[in-house]
Swiss-Prot record:
Residues 388-408 are annotated as: Hydrophobic. It holds the Pfam family Rota_VP4_MID. A motif (KID motif) lies at residues 643-645. Changing E392K: In strain: L27. Residues 65-223 are annotated as: Spike head. Residues 247-478 are annotated as: Spike body and stalk (antigen domain). Residues 483-510 form a coiled coil. The record marks R230, N231, R240, S241, R246, A247 as: Cleavage. A motif (DGE motif) lies at residues 307-309. Disulfide bonds join C317-C379. This is Outer capsid protein VP4.
């Protein structure tokens, strides 16, 4: 049977781990790495060993002891100590505001008897009587409060370190006085502190007032030893001046440069516009049921002005971590239902790939120091009308999330024409008001953003921000780095898969039913399934491994694993307490194991809900206990094989996704039956149920307890020809009991005979199954 391919994928998935391990060991053992000598390997490759140049840092670290500076005249800043080092006798400094403050400090060497000395202060000759009987230097602070007054000695500092200090702070001028090492500070008043200027005749240092304790230490104990060597050269005070320049958001900075390569830092402010893509798929039938409402990747191209430059940008928006919701209004064909609709919430992420035509993206291959900062944006959903043929329409309305920047990486965007190295911005989500509801249903006050109408009529959502990166680019600006050298993070196959899905779905009309039945009866294996793509055995093995890696994470593989565990648990429970077994316990094996006995009792009353729950696991039961009849998976695998052979776009990279998706999505509307003597019990995935006699095809009451017992003990059969088709066939053509029994058992030979006879009812049923094989 063709469905053998699915069983092989389920049972052989374990070999993938072993294959990966062997491949990794082989790679480690045989990998050769060659690095050519010299600064660069080849001109078309990046440097073998490249490092960053100067790293700009906006953090300003203020030194404790800044200097020494050469003698100068300037207006000292407030809140900074001037520490002046006198290396000879005479005037150390002069300071005035030309209104109420004149002061000068005179240095006198040790052991000087009382005498008169001449000094030039503020351009005038002044004579002072000085004396120093100590072994230390003395610094006389001479002061006057007006231009007509005479100087007088206000303070004296006795020091063997030959250091004096001066500070403008708090409307006063502060200096040191006393004798080291116990000198202290004192101050003089002035009404015009800011206009005080100073003429310094010796080398000096600058110390912030926040480090006044250090200044006190230097006055009393001397400068650090390093400041007293001949290697310390005083600088001009102009070297301290800083040219303030407002940083440009958009700029290109050359970090380092050689003959072939240079490092460029690109700073850019950006405007990101994006929109969500979605897909709404309606089930066939009367028009009351929807199959899927899901998010899809969406491209958006736009232009905006940046510093007078017109920029063309391209974004791709995709989502990850979606939450699957469903709504089932009942089992009748006219009951409204949605099999699955996606909602993004707090556990979801939104990815926006951004590219523009500026220099920053031209050679964005070797990148480091990537950083970004973006604003948040709120996305509020709109309304979507489920247009039913009759009655008032349900409306999905509302829902909102806020996007918050969470990181940036490199990526590759695939447009219709070219692949682009771009930036991928990652956003975390928080739910926001309003909540969403499906009006005229029980679904109300849920939070998140559903995929029905995420753009709410807006052409795009917009956010602003900036990014910075350092890129290694060719020194020649006209040279384009080959895209083949790209080390971007991701290779996105979504565009290829989308084209392949369209091709696969269009091939359904070209499948011959007689050949399909023959193919469905063949035991397909890995080689025969993939031989239509590549003829060599080695490539087929590699493709089979890739398919198994993808398939083991599929819903089918996960469901088989969960069911095996559930049945094991149920068997062990039954062996421990065999006497407790009842119909309800049998039913619980086929319903949600987490429900309590009381809940199951309530569910029995709703036969439609119960049968719908059971039918979802009958595919797994049929796959575990294979019968001789044809199954839906045989047809599914045969259609898959046929389309693979007919496809012109299938390839090694897309095959794993296609096989896995086909196993989950081909023939979603299935019916299963169990046969006991002359009675048949049949249910389908939509919750419909029938019980009827084999010989007359007349309906009888459906007993769910009996059905649960039969499912446990009897084989499950795919209802290829369901009860509705059987009834129609019997009413129009008349069939014998043996033909009816063979069709009930899905006998492939009988099916082939009816198709070869061009029976329109059977052919139409098989055609409908083929048309359900869509991606």
């Amino acid at each position: 049977m063709a469905s053998l391919i699915y069983r092989q994928l389920l049972t052989n998935s374990y070999s993938v781990d072993l294959h990966d391990e062997i491949e990794q060991i082989g790679s480690e053992k045989t990998q050769n790495v060659t690095i050519n000598p010299g600064p660069f390997a080849q001109t078309r490759y990046a440097p073998v060993n490249w490092r960053h140049g100067e790293i700009n840092d906006s953090t300003t670290v203020e030194p404790v002891l800044d200097g020494p500076y050469q003698p100068t005249t300037f207006k000292p800043p407030n809140d900074y100590w001037l520490l002046i080092s006198s290396n000879t006798d005479g005037v150390v400094y002069e300071s005035t505001n030309n209104s109420d403050f004149w002061t000068a400090v005179i240095a006198v060497e040790p052991r000087v008897s009382q005498t008169n000395r001449q000094y030039i202060l503020f351009g005038e000759n002044k004579q002072f009587n000085i004396e120093n009987n100590s072994d230390k230097w003395k610094f006389f602070e001479m002061f006057k409060g007006s231009s007509q007054s005479n100087f007088s000695n206000r303070r004296t500092l006795t020091s063997n370190n030959r250091l004096v200090g001066m500070l403008k702070y708090g409307g006063r001028v502060w200096t040191f006085h006393g004798e080291t090492p116990r000198a202290t500070t004192d101050s003089s008043n002035t009404a015009d502190l800011n206009n005080i200027s100073i003429v310094i005749h010796s080398e000096f240092y600058i110390i912030p007032r926040s480090q006044e304790s250090k200044c006190n230490e230097y006055i009393n104990n001397g400068l650090p030893p390093i400041q007293n060597t001949r290697n310390v050269v005083p600088l001009s005070l102009s070297s301290r001046s800083i040219q303030y320049r407002r940083a440009q958001v958009n700029e290109d900075i050359t970090i380092s440069k050689t003959s072939l390569w240079k490092e460029m830092q690109y700073n850019r402010d950006i405007i990101i516009r994006f929109k969500f893509g979605n897909s709404v798929i309606k089930l066939g039938g009367l028009g009351y049921k929807w199959s899927e409402i899901s998010y899809k990747a969406a491209n958006y191209q736009y232009s905006y002005s940046r510093d007078g430059e017109q920029v063309t940008a391209h974004t791709t928006c995709s989502v990850n971590g979606v939450n699957n919701f469903s709504y089932n209004g009942g089992s009748l064909p006219t009951d409204f239902s949605i099999s699955r609709y996606e909602v993004i919430k707090e556990n979801s992420y939104v990815y926006i790939d951004y590219w523009d035509d500026s220099k920053a993206f031209r050679n964005m291959v070797y990148v480091r120091s990537l950083a970004a900062n973006l604003n948040s944006v709120k996305c509020a959903g709109g309304s979507y009308n489920f247009r039913l043929p009759v009655g008032e329409w349900p409306i999905m309305n509302g829902g909102a999330v806020s996007l918050h920047f969470a990181g940036v990486t490199l990526s590759t965007q695939f447009t219709n024409f070219v692949s682009l190295n771009s930036l991928r911005f990652r956003f975390s989500l928080t739910v926001d008001e309003p909540s969403f509801s499906i009006i005229r249903t029980r679904t109300v006050n849920l939070y998140g953003l559903p995929a029905a109408n995420p753009n709410n009529g807006n052409e795009y959502y917009e956010m602003s921000g900036r990014f910075s990166l350092i890129s290694l680019v060719p020194t020649n600006d006209d040279y384009q780095t080959p895209i083949m050298n790209s080390v971007t993070v991701r290779q996105d196959l979504e565009r290829q898969l989308s084209d392949l899905r369209e091709e696969f779905n269009s091939l359904s009309q070209e499948i011959a039913m007689s050949q399909l039945i023959d193919l469905a009866l063949l035991p397909l294996d890995m080689f025969s399934m993939f031989s239509g793509i590549k003829s060599t055995i080695d490539l087929t093995k590699s493709m089979a491994t890739s398919v198994m890696k993808k398939f083991r994470k599929s819903k089918l593989a996960t469901s088989i694993s969960e069911m095996t565990n559930s049945l094991s648990d149920a068997a062990s429970s039954a062996s421990r307490s065999a006497s407790v077994r009842s119909n309800l316990s049998v039913i619980s094996n086929w319903t949600d194991a987490s429900k309590s006995t009381s809940n199951i009792t309530d569910l029995v009353n709703d036969v439609s809900t119960q049968t719908s729950t059971i039918s979802k696991k009958l595919r797994l039961k049929e796959m575990i206990t294979q019968t001789e009849g044809m199954s839906f998976d045989d047809i599914s695998a045969a259609v898959l094989k046929t389309k693979i052979d007919m496809s012109t776009q299938i390839g090694k990279n897309t095959l794993p996704d296609i096989v896995t998706e086909a196993s989950e999505k081909f023939i979603p509307k299935r019916s299963y039956r169990v046969l006991k003597d002359n009675e048949v019990m049949e249910i389908n995935t939509e919750g419909k149920f029938f019980a009827y006699k084999v010989d007359t095809l007349n309906e009888i009451p459906f007993d769910i307890n009996k059905f649960a017992e039969l499912v446990t003990d009897s084989p499950v059969i795919s209802a290829i020809i369901d009860f509705k088709t059987l009834k129609n066939l019997n009413d129009n053509y008349g069939i014998t009991r043996m033909e009816a029994l063979n069709l009930i058992k899905s006998n492939p030979n009988v099916l082939r005979n009816f198709i070869n006879q061009n029976n329109p009812i059977i052919r139409n049923r098989i055609e409908q199954l083929i048309l359900q094989c869509k991606l």
